[in-house]
Structures are given as C-alpha cells and as structure tokens.
C-alpha cells in the first residue's frame, strides 16, 4: 500500500479533498489494485481505536455496577461529534436565511419600490456567498461524522472479536454464529453512514422553529396550515411505513422458504444432478417465488406511494400556507416565492431529516445495548497450573455443560433479589438443584504418569471430548479436582486449518526447529502430499483448507499438535478421515515412537490402540465404566465391546433409537395449540435418566422466574443466507433449540426462558458456536468432492449455516509464553482473504441497461409513457407560472394602496382568485399524472426481476459441474438472495426516484430557460460538466466499492475461522496473534472504505461547486437582464434554488442506480453460463431386444419398464480420463476395466487417490474423455439425463431438502403411496416414517435434522430403489454411522439390490469383504483389478491394510464350506471394533 497523501496535505487540500486526486486519476485510466489504496492514518488503525475504547470500557466496568457502553463511547468521541454537529447546524441555518435575501431581491423589482433596485446586485452577491458558505460547512461536517462513525464501528468490531476469544464454552453453547455475524454486520454498519443524520434530532426542531418564525412574519397564523399539513403527511408516511413493514415481515417468511430450498440446492448441486432433479427443484423454487412476488408487489406499491407523497406534497404545502392569508388580506408575489423557498426547506426537515434522525438514534442505541449485553457475558477462566507437576490426575470430577451449582445459586439469588420475592418463594432456590440435568461427566477418577498413553473410549455421546475439554479448562468442574502442568497441546476431532501456508499451520507461532519439523512431517505421513505442491509446504491454504482432502487436513492438524513441545498431548479421534493403512502407520510412527516419552490422552475405539495403551478409560453415559490396563479390561469387563460401541443388542438398540427420535420430534415440534407429548412418555426413551430428574425439572428455575415459552421449530432465517453454510449432517442433539432464535429487532441475546423439561437435557442445544466448532468442519472424505478441486477459488464468504447469535464478556490476561511477531506479510493476507476482482466492468455498461430494458417488452412502453406525462407536466407548469408571474390583480373599484406597502395586493374579491383555482386544478392534475406515471413503472420492473430470477435459476441448474466448481456456494447464493432482493426492493424504487428527480431538474431548467433564454446558455456547460464529472468519478468509486466489499469478507471469514478453532487457539495461546490478524483485516477494509468516503465527498463537493457557479450565473443574468416585474425574477431564482437542493439528490440517485445495476450485471453473468450437454453427441441407434428406442425423450414422468435399458447393469469402461475443469490436470488417467451384471466391486486406495472422483466421472459430473458403456449403450449416444437415470446414488453428503418425506423420496410425484410404502419396507424406513405425525406428509426441515445420519442414508437407498436403477454407486455410506445403523443399511443393500451392480467406495474392511472384485487406484491410475483372494496373495494395498487375523477369517469363508457360518460372526465382531467418528458433547 502507498503512503497516504493526506498526511502531508495542506488545510485547503483537506477542506476540498484534493488529496484524493491521484487515486481518482489512476482509477479512471486503469483498474485499481490493492496496492493502489492508501495506508490508513494511524488514528484510524484498529489497534489504536480498540485500545482506546477498551480502556474506557474497562474503566466503566471497574467503576459501576451497571456499566454503560455509551458512556465509554462518549468519552472517546463526544467532543469531535459535537464540533461537527455545530458545523452541520450552521450549514443548515444558511438554508433558512437564503429565502430572506430572495424575498428582498424580488421586492426590489416591484415598480413601486425602485429605491431598492440599486442594492439588488449586492443582495445577489450575498445570496451566492451563502451558498458558498453552506458548501464549505456541510461537506467537512458530513465527512467528519462519517469518519467518526467508521472509527466507532472499528473500535466495537475489535472489542467484540476480542470478547469472542474469551468466551466460556458454556456461553458458546448457547449462541450461534449467525447472531454474531448479524451483530457485526446489521447493527454496526448503522454507525458508518447513520451518524451523519444523528444531529438532526436537535437540528431539525431548531430549523423548524426558525423557519416558522420567518414564515409567521410573512403570513401570520396561516403559516401553521402548511406546517400542520406536513405533520399530517409525516404521520401518513409513518402509517404507510408500518403497513410496508407488515408486508415485508410476511414476505420475509416466504423469502426464507425460497432461500432455504435454494441454499440446499446449491450446497447439494452435485446430488441434484446425480438424481436428475433439476426440473423438480426449479418447479419447487418457482412456486415459492410466485407467492413471494405477490407480497413484494404490495410492499413496493406502499413504498411507492410513500415516496410519491413527498414529491407531490410541495404544491399543497405552499397552497395551504398562502391561501388563508390571501383570502383574508391578499398577497404579493414576493411573499409567494419566499414562502415557496421556506417550504422546500421546511418539508425536508419535517418529513425526512427528523424521522430519519429519530430512527438512527433508535437503531444505534439498540445496537449499543446489544453489544453492551454481549460484552458482559461470562468469560473463559484460565485455570491455575503447577508447571512442576509431571502426572495428570483427576479426582471425583463431575461437570455439566449447563451452569454449575455456584453459577445457578448466584443467578437465582440475584433474580430473587431483583424481584424482591417473599419468603414463600425461598424454596424456589433450594428445590431446584436437581434441575441441573444429567452431568456430562460423573465421578471421573484416573491418574497417569509422565510418558504414559491413556486411551479413552466410549459410545457416541459418552463424554470423551468433554473429558478433554475439562483438562483444557474449557469445561469447569462442578465437583472434584484436576491436576496437571498446564503445558498442553491439542488435536481436535474435526481438523481445523487457518488461512496461511502448511508450514504456518504446523508451526503455529512456536519457534522453528528444522529437525523437529521434518520429524513431525515424516511421522504424520505428510512428505508425499507436500512434495506434490509446487510451493511445497509454503502453499497458501484458504479458509478451512478447502483445497485439501479430509485426510490431509486431519494429518496437518495432528502435526500441529505434535510439533508443539508440551507435557500433555490431547488427541481427540485424530484418525477419523484416514484410510486404514495410513492410520496404522501414523499411530505406530507418531503416537507410539515419536511421542513415546510424552504423556498422551488419545480418544479412540480401535482395539489395536487399546492394546498398546498403558491405561484405558471407558466412558458410558458420562460415567467411568472401566479404568485400568487392557488385560484387566478383558478379565473384569467381558461385556466391554457393547459399552465401547454403545449398544447391548441389535434389535433392542434400534428400537430405542427410533422411539427416541419419535419422542424428541413430537416434543419439540408441538406448536401452539398442539398437545405436547406427556413427560411420562418421554421418561421411557433411550436417553437413560432417573425419573426424579425428569419430574423435578418440570419446575425448572428459569421457568419459574420467566414466562414459559411454547416450543417451536427452529427454521433458517434470512440471516442464514448471508454466506455461512454449515454441514447438514448435524445430529438431532444440536439441530433443535428450545430457545427461540432472536429476530431482527429483538434483543440479540434472548432471555433464557426455558430449561429443558424432558430427560434429554443435551438435546436442548441449538446450532450454537460450540456446535459449529465440533461439527461444522465435518469434512468427511472431504465434505463435498467439489470443494477439493484444486482449481476451486478460495472461499472468502463464511461457509457455515448462518442462523443467529448470543454471546461474550471481560478481558483475558495478555500474558503469553510465545513471542508473537507483529509483522504480517500483506501478500499472504491478500492471498488468504481476497477474491479475484469480479470480471464485470467497474461501471455498468450501456449494454446491461439496454438488455435490462428490453427484457420485458412492456418496459419500453412504460418509459415512453413516463416521458409523455413529463412533457404534459412541464407544459402545465409553464402555464401556471406564466399566470403567476405576469398577472396583476387589482380590482378597480376596491383597489387599496398604501404608501407604507411596497407591493401590489390581491384584493379580497372572488373574481380575482381564479389564479388559485387554476393553481389547485393544475396541482391535482400533476399529482394524478405523477401517480399514473410511476405505478406502472414499479410494477413492470418487479416483473423484470421475476424473469431474471427464473432465467438465472434455470441457468444454474443446467450449468456443468466444471463451471460450478469454480464458483463459491456462498457467491451463488448471494445472487439469489442479495442480488434478487436488490432487484425486487431497491432497484425499482431507486429508478423511480432517479427518473422523478431528473425530470424535476430538467423541468426546472426548461422553465427557467423559457423565461430567460440567456440562462439556457449557462445550463449547457453545466450539464456537460456534470456528465463528465460523473463518468470520471464513477470509474474509481465503483472499483473502490468492489475493493471495500472484497475487504469486508475476510473480517467475517476470520471471525468464523477463529471460532471454529477456538479450542486450538486457546490451547496454543495464540489469541494475541489472531487479534493482530483481525486488526490487519480490519485495516485493509478501512483503507478502501475511508478512501471511498473521501472520493465520494470530493465528488459531492465538486457537483455543488459547479452549481454554485451556475446559481451565480443565473442570479446575475436574471438581475441584470430583467426589467420591470418581480414575477420573472422570483420564478427564476426560486427554481434555481430548487435545482440546487434537488440536483445533489438526483446525482446520488444516479450513482445508486449504477451501483444497483451491477447486481443486474452479475445476474446476467450467471444467466450466460454454459449449459450441460443435454443431447447425445452421436446419432441414436436402435438396439437389440428393444433396449433403446431410436428416440428417447426424458420427461418428468418417465417410468422405467422392465424391458427398458438398462436391464442387466453390465459396465465397460475404456480409457476414462477425468478433470475438474477443462484444460486442468487429470484427476484420473486412462482408466479401463469392465463389470459384469450384478457384480459388486470395491474401490481401494489411499485418501485422495480419486475413488470418489471415479464415481463422479461415471455420472458425467466432471470433464471426461474416453467411453463408458452400460449394457452395450455408449454414454455418447443418449441424453445426459437418461444416462444418469441408470444409476442409483448414495453420496458422502446425504441430500435431504426442506419438504415432506414423500417429496424427498419422489420429487416428481410419479409413485403412489402404496409403492412408496413398499419401498420403505424394503429398506427398513417404514418404522421411522410411521412414528412422525403425518407420516409421508411430515415436513423435514433443516437438512432433515430430526433424522439420524443412518436414516438419511436409508432415504437415499429408497430413492435408488424407486428409480429402478440397475447400478448402485455408494460413496462412504458408513461414514459417521454407528455400527447398528450400518448393519441396517447392509441388510437393506442385500435385500433391495440383490440383482444390481454395486460399486462401493468404503474404508470399513468388513464392508469390502462382500465384494467379488476390487479396483485398486494409485496415483490417478488403476494399479490392480482382481478378486480378494488374488489381492491377499500378492503384495497389494489391500493386503497391507488388512490384519492377519482378518485374513485368517476370510479364507475359510471363501474356500471352505466348513466355515460357512464364521464370516457373519467374524464380520460382526470386526464391526464392534470400528470407531464411530462422531462425538457429541
């Protein structure tokens, strides 16, 4: 970045913003880059501002019981805020004084007042000087207030971020990411631009008082008629605003429904294409869009009338002010024109400035209070450790994720004190200790010496991760003691990658040791992966490490933990995404050898790991089921397998699982008016808890204190759509919330009004920050294959589901054992955080405008209609003004003339009032014409928005995956949310405002030019200067806005990244470093935003200067060339002043239109995306046995018959090569093999070898070369949809969209209920569906959150059965499944797909044993394709991965009838040894 010219700029340069000229010049000539932006002044740096506010906030916390954030802000910014407010007031006062001078100038042209003619020129100079003074006062004042608002935002941004890093995990479990992002974006952005309006809360009343005093002097009591009309108008507009909000609230729900489906479609676009659901999804979304648009139109019409009321009220304000006075006393033209000028200013103050100011204060104070509440949230407490301690000891430890006894005691005591409860309520406190719920850990005891390995095992939800959190201090014990040295290293279950290089991720701020680094890289099997990158370990990874596979991310996370020199290493299921062989090697070389002298606690369920552990701790439902050595375990606990894996018997467990789902669903989904499931029923469910807990918690403390709320379904809100998308595979325990999410306008930290009154306390948690930390990085064999494309852009938009928020509190000790480097490479930051600049022009092209206008044929006619009505208005105005300016009303019989009055008086005679009748008639006509002009325009523009949405949706659904892989999911969703919202809401009204203002200015110039032709000569250069200046400014301003927008994304990305890795950050003590990173991101954004504000003010000031010159020319031309008659001078000067006040608004509107039209450009860019090849590339031939007709057309209602292709499922693959994008590197090369009908083929290979890619290639989701035939039919000879219909798919990431069970199973509505139930029976889904109210019509929301992952897999199986597919592709179907559910799926596969060809990609050994053939993929090529016997006899990857005992079990099964019953038992036993890769706290 360049050094800012502002630092050396002179006072004049700062006053006129001339220091911005270099960047304006460069932006006009070429595209601006980040390096062209100026460095921010030191006063604006996030470090300085946050330190200043933090100091005042700490002072506020220390000095008061009820600290107020606004007091801290006041001490930081009050005096500058007040100074600019006074400047603003003085600038506004000049507007009130100008009409006085105008009146004197008009009076000087009265034939009876020739004495003042000589001073008219001086009055004109004074009038012009007032305009100059106003310009010099207002622009610095507005810029100064914008600047203060920006500084306040930066300081509060930083304060909030620092607070997030200090929050206790218990608080994090009660908040959600979306609320936090909402707090930062929706609330804090109000300060940036709203602060300039804040002073009008006192300026506007003073302005009104001054103006009314001046109008009173002219018109006496009748002045209040105009004011009364304006107040009524303001109330009318407020009523319209309330009505508009009602429609918008109703519409928000419809938008939410559409965006939820759209988001699910985008996130699962690969599945949509695999299932051939493009048309079904398009129809569903368009139906929702249709309903939404009805409410959009209603809201737009109300807003249109609201806007029009302001434009057309001018006539009536003047008329109502003048008429009563004229009827009683008569009136002179001087008073009419002076009153018109006063009323222009008065109208703005009453109907715009004051209401806006009140709204600004309301919003700002609300935001400050939300932040204040947030900053007082409970903080993470650093535990006191003894560095000399060598062992790790835990004695009688019990802990709750909910508040412990101490916190609960204080809370209830405080509530009782606040409410002054009587003695009768005292037992409220004592009777509720039992309401704390089930402890997550109960009476845990163990002791491990230095250098020992403790293996922690247990079923899902047993408390394994909670145990590690306890040791780290993230979870506070309610009872017991924990003892260790405090020097901890931690590897999370879900790998966390920060933006930066691989090397930076591993070293993570610890001093660099080359030998140790190389040893760790080798032990974690990263050498081969790093060698593949051109930059080696210096390759920059984006947020979340999206360019890496799940296994690579897991190994980097493990390497980070191992590299740090610590006394205790906490490894939470670090091998989750590794293949069997890699896991085996890393466990031996890293955990057992490299870390042999270190104390290690490893969460695992692998039998091999337990055997090599010094001590074993098995947890069951939070309690210690066993603690000791492996030999003791075998002797004392022979039933340990069932506890380890979390089930006692297959049938019993599956029944309990289904019952618990039913009960939890009914309990949570009982809405108002529905009877909830009784709690006695709930007690019978699988979450084992004493009846005493269940009964007593009905009277929970907080339920007694606060009012009980009805349970509600937590649905996604529009806030979710801003960019963060979370993995949809979340368990029931975290997807449902009993605490209603806050809506916009509610307290952002909602009152905790409910403690769960059912036995399953842990089910209470919502999609909290804690939940995101433990689940959102659920990247499986890397979340979706599309995100692992090496060519995919780094995702800057937050990528987890935005729901809402509620968090934070005080300061953490700044002491850290690490030296933090303050120097941060700006290029790395840029590479990590910034997108490529959009490939659309900086300024909206004329082609975009033309394409937009011609999109709907009616729009052209509407624009022509607007022009015709405008010409009629101008003609009517000329007639009216001619009458006012050239008619003198003096009744000869009743004429009165006073030598004291220097003006002609209209006598109170009815025959003389015809001018007013004409005035009223013309005003009414113009009002009617104005409404008729705008309403069709708004209606038509919304119709255009409808067309654009339809075209874009169709284009995205038909785009090839190679194109979609280069786009971020958040970016696509922004087109459907942000850009469509702009097209619906902002663009139609902004275009209307711009056209309205433009016509007012042009009309005024036309009238002035007709009355005084010389003035027309002055308007020509002014219009030319305006057009050139606007074009000059727009080139730079739009580029600066792009840079600002690009700079905003990393702020939120960094926040989400930090929260995902918060436990890791704290374990490593890296909070100061991440605060520095956050400040750097803030400063990069500030640089662009501050420069944009400065250039905008430069432009506004130049526009005003041009029109000051124009007004000076108009004033002197009118004064020097006008002879007798005050009418002409009055009209000319009044209209010139009106031009001055209106033009700035028109200029801003023109810039807004250009800015909003960029959304249209982005939509057009999506509409113009290439489409998938839908037609066969070869001529279709007739095949034998009628397998394929000459013409096969795919329709929504195609139903496969038994004799239609494919019939057998034979596949022949020849020279298949696959790439993610055209011209990219080959992911698979020259793959050739064949599969017999009904055969089962297993895909083998290391993590990232291309197994999932091969399945995608079969479906033609990638750029492919070569040929594949199914039953003799080549993929080139039939349509794409036909080809994909041949396959049934069970993907890694299961796709459940918001809709009924029936819609999810059969979106095209082809099948009857009987057929669907039959298939549900086959796959074991009937018992699940039947337990939900409504059965097939039960609506699944939030990715099917009420279903387990296994039930979602069964849904996919049912879809495949319904599709009559002959070839089944399974991609890691057992990932994140407990063994029992996996057994159900295996059984369903055998029954429903007995005669189908099955291609299986799987890590579980026992699942692969049922395959007849195995395809081994290494280095993107086929290495082996043989039967299991041959692979085991040779030195193959499979042989290395499978243990000796497994091989001994296999051969009898394959070669001898003697052991026919063995495999089932052996397989089941192996099943029990598998790790369940999902930990719920």
Swiss-Prot record:
Reaction(s) catalysed by this chain's protein: ATP + H2O + closed Cl(-) channel = ADP + phosphate + open Cl(-) channel; chloride(in) = chloride(out); hydrogencarbonate(in) = hydrogencarbonate(out); ATP + H2O = ADP + phosphate + H(+)
Post-translational modification: N-glycosylated. Phosphorylated; cAMP treatment promotes phosphorylation and activates the channel. Dephosphorylation decreases the ATPase activity (in vitro). Phosphorylation at PKA sites activates the channel. Phosphorylation at PKC sites enhances the response to phosphorylation by PKA. Phosphorylated by AMPK; this inhibits channel activity.
Topology versus the membrane: Multi-pass membrane protein
Compositionally biased region (Acidic residues): 1471-1481
Domain ABC transporter, first and last residues per copy: 423-646, 1211-1444
Domain characteristics, as noted in the entry: Binds and hydrolyzes ATP via the two cytoplasmic ABC transporter nucleotide-binding domains. The two ATP-binding domains interact with each other, forming a head-to-tail dimer. Normal ATPase activity requires interaction between the two domains. The first ABC transporter nucleotide-binding domain has no ATPase activity by itself. The PDZ-binding motif mediates interactions with GOPC and with the SLC4A7, NHERF1/EBP50 complex.
UniProt name for this protein: Cystic fibrosis transmembrane conductance regulator
Annotated organism of origin: Saimiri boliviensis boliviensis
Name of the coding gene: CFTR
């Amino acid at each position: 970045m360049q050094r800012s010219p502002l630092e050396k700029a002179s006072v004049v340069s700062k006053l006129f913003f001339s220091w911005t000229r270099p960047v304006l010049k460069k932006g006009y000539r070429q595209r601006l880059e980040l390096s062209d932006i100026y460095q921010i002044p030191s006063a604006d740096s996030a470090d300085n501002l946050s330190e200043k506010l933090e100091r005042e906030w700490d002072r506020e916390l220390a000095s008061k019981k009820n600290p107020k954030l606004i007091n801290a802000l006041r001490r930081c910014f009050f005096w500058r805020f007040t100074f600019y407010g006074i400047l603003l007031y003085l600038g506004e006062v000049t507007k009130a004084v100008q009409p006085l001078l105008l009146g004197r100038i008009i009076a000087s042209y009265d034939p009876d007042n020739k004495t003042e003619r000589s001073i008219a020129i001086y009055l004109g100079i004074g009038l012009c000087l007032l305009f100059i003074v106003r310009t010099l006062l207002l622009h610095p004042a507005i810029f100064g207030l914008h600047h203060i608002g920006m500084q306040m935002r930066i300081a509060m941004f930083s304060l909030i971020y620092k607070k997030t890093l200090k929050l206790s995990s218990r608080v994090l479990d009660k908040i959600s990411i979306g609320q936090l992002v909402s707090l930062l974006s929706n609330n804090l952005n109000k300060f940036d631009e709203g602060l300039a309006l804040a002073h009008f809360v006192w300026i506007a009343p003073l302005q009104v008082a001054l103006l009314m005093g001046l109008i009173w002097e002219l018109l006496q009591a009748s002045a209040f008629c105009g004011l009364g009309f304006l107040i009524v108008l303001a109330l009318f507009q407020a009523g319209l605003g309330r009505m508009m909000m009602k429609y918008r609230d109703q519409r928000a729900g419809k938008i939410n429904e559409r965006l939820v489906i759209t988001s699910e479609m985008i996130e699962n676009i690969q599945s949509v294409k695999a299932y051939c659901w493009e048309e079904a999804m398009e129809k569903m979304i368009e139906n929702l869009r249709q309903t939404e648009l009805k409410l959009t139109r209603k809201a737009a019409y109300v807003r249109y009338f609201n806007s029009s009321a302001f434009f057309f009220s001018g006539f009536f304000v003047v008329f109502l002010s003048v008429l009563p006075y004229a009827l009683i006393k008569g009136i002179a033209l001087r008073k009419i024109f002076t009153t018109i000028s006063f009323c222009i200013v008065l109208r703005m103050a009453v109907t715009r400035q004051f209401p806006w100011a009140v709204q600004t204060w309301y919003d700002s104070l609300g935001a400050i209070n939300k932040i204040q509440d947030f900053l007082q949230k409970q903080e993470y407490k650093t535990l006191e450790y003894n560095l000399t301690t060598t062992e790790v000891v835990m004695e009688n430890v019990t802990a709750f994720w909910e508040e412990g006894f101490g916190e609960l005691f204080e809370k209830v005591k405080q509530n009782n004190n606040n409410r002054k409860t009587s003695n009768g309520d005292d037992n409220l406190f004592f009777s509720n200790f039992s309401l704390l719920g089930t402890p997550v850990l109960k009476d845990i005891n163990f002791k491990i010496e230095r250098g020992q390995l403790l293996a922690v095992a247990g079923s899902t939800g047993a408390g394994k991760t909670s145990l590690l959190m306890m040791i780290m201090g993230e979870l506070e014990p309610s009872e017991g003691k924990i003892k260790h040295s405090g020097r901890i290293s931690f590897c999370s279950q879900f790998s966390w990658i920060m933006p930066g290089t691989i090397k930076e991720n591993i070293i993570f701020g610890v001093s660099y040791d080359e030998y140790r680094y190389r040893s760790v890289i080798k032990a974690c099997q990263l050498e081969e992966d790093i060698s593949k990158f051109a930059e080696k370990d210096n390759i920059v990874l984006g947020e979340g490490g999206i360019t890496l596979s799940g296994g690579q991310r897991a190994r980097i996370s493990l390497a980070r933990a191992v590299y740090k020199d610590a006394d205790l290493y906490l490894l939470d299921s670090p091998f989750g995404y590794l293949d069997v062989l890699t896991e085996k090697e890393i466990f031996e070389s890293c955990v057992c050898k490299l870390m042999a002298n270190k104390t290690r606690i490893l969460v695992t369920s692998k039998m091999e790991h337990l055997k090599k552990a010094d001590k074993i701790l098995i947890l069951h439902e939070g309690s210690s089921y066993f603690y000791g050595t492996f030999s003791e375990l075998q002797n004392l606990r022979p039933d340990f397998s069932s506890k380890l894996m979390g089930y006692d018997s297959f049938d019993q467990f599956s029944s309990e699982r289904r019952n618990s789902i039913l009960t939890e669903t009914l309990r949570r989904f009982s809405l108002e008016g529905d009877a909830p499931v009784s709690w006695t029923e709930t007690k019978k469910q699988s979450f084992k808890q004493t009846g005493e807990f269940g009964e007593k918690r009905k009277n929970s403390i907080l339920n007694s204190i606060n009012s009980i709320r009805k349970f509600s379904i937590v649905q996604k809100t529009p806030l979710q759509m801003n960019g963060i998308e979370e993995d949809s595979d979340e368990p029931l325990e975290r997807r449902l919330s009993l605490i209603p999410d806050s809506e916009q306008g509610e307290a952002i930290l909602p009152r905790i009004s409910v403690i769960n009154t059912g036995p399953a306390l842990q089910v209470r948690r919502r999609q909290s920050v804690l939940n995101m930390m433990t689940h959102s990085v659920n990247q499986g064999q890397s979340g979706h294959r599309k995100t692992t494309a090496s060519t995919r852009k780094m995702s800057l938009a937050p990528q987890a589901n935005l729901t809402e928020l509620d968090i934070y509190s005080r300061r953490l000790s700044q002491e850290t054992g690490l030296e933090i480097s303050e120097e941060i490479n700006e290029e790395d930051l840029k590479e990590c955080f910034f997108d490529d600049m959009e490939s659309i022009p900086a300024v909206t092209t004329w082609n975009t405008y033309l394409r937009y206008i011609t999109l709907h044929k009616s729009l052209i006619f509407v624009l022509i209609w607007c022009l015709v009505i405008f010409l009629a208005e101008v003609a009517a105005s000329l007639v009216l003004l001619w009458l006012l300016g050239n008619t003198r009303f003096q009744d000869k019989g009743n004429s009165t003339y006073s030598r004291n009055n220097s003006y002609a008086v209209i006598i109170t005679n009815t025959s003389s009032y015809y001018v007013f009748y004409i005035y009223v008639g013309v005003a009414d006509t113009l009002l009617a014409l104005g409404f008729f002009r705008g309403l069709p325009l708004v209606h038509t523009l919304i119709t255009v928005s409808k067309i654009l949405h339809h075209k874009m949706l169709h284009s995205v659904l038909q785009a090839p995956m190679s194109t979609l892989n280069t786009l971020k999911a958040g970016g696509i969703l922004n087109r459907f949310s942000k850009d469509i919202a702009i097209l619906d809401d902002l663009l139609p009204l902004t275009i209307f405002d711009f056209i309205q203002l433009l016509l007012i200015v042009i009309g005024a110039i036309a009238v002035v030019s007709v009355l005084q032709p010389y003035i027309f000569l002055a308007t020509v250069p002014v219009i030319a200067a305006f057009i050139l200046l606007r074009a000059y400014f727009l080139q730079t301003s739009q580029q600066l806005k792009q840079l600002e927008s690009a700079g905003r994304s990393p702020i939120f990305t960094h926040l989400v990244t930090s929260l995902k890795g918060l436990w890791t950050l704290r374990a490593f003590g890296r909070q100061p470093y991440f605060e520095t990173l956050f400040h750097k991101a803030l400063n990069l954004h500030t640089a662009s935003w501050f420069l944009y504000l400065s250039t905008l003010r430069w432009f506004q000031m130049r526009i005003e200067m041009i029109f000051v010159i124009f007004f000076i020319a108009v004033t002197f031309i009118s004064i020097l060339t006008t002879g007798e008659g005050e009418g002409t001078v009055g009209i000319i000067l009044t209209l010139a002043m009106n031009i001055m006040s209106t033009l700035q608004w028109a200029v801003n509107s023109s810039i807004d239109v250009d800015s909003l039209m960029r959304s249209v450009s982005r939509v057009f860019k999506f509409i113009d995306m290439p489409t998938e090849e839908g037609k066969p590339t070869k001529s279709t031939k007739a095949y034998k046995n009628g397998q394929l007709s000459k013409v096969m057309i795919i329709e929504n209602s195609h139903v496969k018959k038994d004799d239609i292709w494919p019939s057998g499922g034979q596949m022949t693959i020849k020279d298949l090569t696959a790439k993610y994008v055209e011209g990219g590197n080959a992911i698979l090369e020259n793959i050739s093999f064949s599969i017999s009908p009904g055969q089962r083929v297993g895909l083998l290979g290391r993590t990232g070898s291309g197994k999932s890619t091969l399945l995608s290639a079969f479906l033609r989701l990638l750029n492919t070369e070569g040929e594949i035939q199914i039953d003799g039919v080549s993929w080139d000879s039939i349509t794409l949809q036909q080809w994909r219909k041949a396959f049934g798919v069970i993907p890694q990431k299961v796709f459940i969209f918001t809709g009924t069970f029936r819609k999810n199973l059969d979106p095209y509505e082809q099948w009857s209920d009987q057929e669907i139930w039959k298939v549900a029976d086959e796959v074991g889904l009937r018992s699940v569906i039947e337990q939900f109210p409504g059965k097939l019509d039960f609506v699944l929301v939030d990715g099917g959150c009420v279903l387990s992952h296994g039930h979602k897999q069964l849904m996919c199986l049912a879809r495949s059965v319904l599709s009559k597919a002959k070839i089944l592709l399974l991609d890691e179907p057992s990932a994140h499944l407990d063994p029992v559910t996996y057994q159900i799926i295996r059984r369903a596969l055998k029954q429903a797909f007995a005669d189908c060809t099955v291609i299986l990609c799987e890590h579980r050994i026992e699942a692969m044993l049922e395959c007849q053939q195995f395809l081994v993929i290494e280095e993107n090529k086929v290495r082996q394709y043989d039967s299991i016997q041959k692979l085991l006899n040779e030195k193959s990857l499979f042989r290395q991965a499978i243990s000796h005992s497994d091989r001994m079990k296999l051969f009898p099964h394959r070669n001898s009838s003697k052991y026919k019953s063995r495999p089932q038992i052996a397989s089941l036993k192996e099943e029990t040894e598998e790790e369940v890769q999902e930990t719920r706290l």
